[in-house]
UniProtKB/Swiss-Prot annotation:
One of its GO terms (molecular function) is mRNA binding. HAMAP family: Ribosomal_bL12. The gene is rplL. It comes from the Bacteria. SUPFAM superfamilies: ClpS-like (SSF54736), Ribosomal protein L7/12, oligomerisation (N-terminal) domain (SSF48300). InterPro entries: Ribosomal_bL12, Ribosomal_bL12_C, Ribosomal_bL12_C/ClpS-like, Ribosomal_bL12_oligo, Ribosomal_bL12_oligo_N_sf. Forms part of the ribosomal stalk which helps the ribosome interact with GTP-bound translation factors. Is thus essential for accurate translation. This is Large ribosomal subunit protein bL12. Keywords: Ribonucleoprotein, Ribosomal protein. Gene3D superfamilies: 3.30.1390.10, Single helix bin. The lineage of its organism: Bacteria, Bacillati, Cyanobacteriota, Cyanophyceae, Nostocales. It holds the Pfam family Ribosomal_L12_N. GO terms for cellular component: cytosolic large ribosomal subunit. The keyword Ribonucleoprotein applies.
């Protein structure tokens, strides 16, 4: 490499990430180019994988109800609901509630998951459905 290119390379190495991003934008504008990946081979290979990954999300039929957290003053109410939903004994349900975040029910139908979420939230727990 020439001295000029060595000097440019050294200057590029010293740029912060923000400065490098700004430089890329300026180069794109100045030369009318794009730093995005070409629309050829790599993108074509990634597209079917991305489409296949998107399909299961649209057709998801099984959901997990995850208890994220329980305020201390609501623990007993949430514990009762968890016992009703899961059919667990008192000790097992207590262990589950205290181990939050933890899955309460797994691989259940959407309506059952939404119902469980609603009941636990009404009792005071924080829940997510995945």
């Amino acid at each position: 490499m020439s001295a000029a290119t060595d000097q440019i390379l050294d200057q590029l190495k010293s740029l912060s990430l923000l400065e490098a991003a700004e430089l890329v934008k300026q180069i794109e504008e100045a030369f009318g180019v794009s730093a995005a990946a070409p629309a050829g081979g790599m993108m074509m290979m990634a597209a079917p994988g991305a489409a296949a990954a998107a399909e299961p999300v649209e057709e998801q039929t099984e959901f997990d109800v995850v208890l994220e957290s329980v305020p201390a003053d609501k623990k007993i109410a949430v514990l009762k609901i968890v016992r009703e939903i899961t059919g667990l004994g008192l000790k097992e349900a207590k262990d589950l509630v205290e181990a939050a975040p933890k899955a309460v029910k797994e691989a259940i139908a959407k309506d059952a998951a939404e119902d469980a979420k609603k009941r636990i939230e009404e009792a005071g727990g924080k829940v997510t459905v995945k």
